[in-house]
């Protein structure tokens, strides 16, 4: 009895080992089929996820329709990417143009600031020059106005002439006299000299009032203009 027990136990161990070896060894055909089935299941899961992302209808849930929709979606995406690239290039060019314009505006503002500062300096200099100096004497216009207020009767005698009273103008109204006119009257009236005397008499009041100046009338030669030449010829003949 004792010798049989170890033999039976060894047989059972060998039987279990054989069963394990049989279970671990899988035929090649069965292993390939399992791998293909797993791949198909994985692809089916990927197609289902793609259909969910593309939001396709259940009627068009075939793999061909899913692939067509995916290609169309990718074309749209690539078109949007190209348009975005073009917009990016245009924005870069516009940004460079804006930077150049900004630099030009800065230069113009700097030039304007310098011009404004120069003009302010000129205005300040002119304002300082135009300030009255209390140590100097007043202007001749002030003396003229003051003299008109003090001596209105003298100013009324010479309304057309200015009167200046000051250090630079020591002229008074009493020293002004009308210029004397010399008239030459022949024995016989000469029309030429008569016209000259009439013109001098007509111009005499105009010398005091320059506002009433009239244009002289033209005079043409007449037969009386040869009187002086005839008289000289007769005198020469008598002297011979």
Curated annotation (Swiss-Prot):
CDD domains: bHLH_AtILR3_like (cd11446)
Ranges of Polar residues composition bias in the record: 1-13, 128-138
Subcellular location(s) per record: Nucleus
Keyword Nucleus annotated: yes
UniProt superkingdom: Eukaryota
Region (Disordered): 1-26, 128-153
Gene Ontology cellular-component annotations: nucleus
GO molecular function, one term: protein dimerization activity
UniProt keyword list: Coiled coil, DNA-binding, Nucleus, Transcription, Transcription regulation
Coiled-coil regions listed: 98-131
Self-association and partners: Homodimer. Forms heterodimer with PYEL proteins bHLH115, bHLH104 and ILR3.
Protein name per Swiss-Prot or TrEMBL: Transcription factor bHLH47
Gene source species: Arabidopsis thaliana
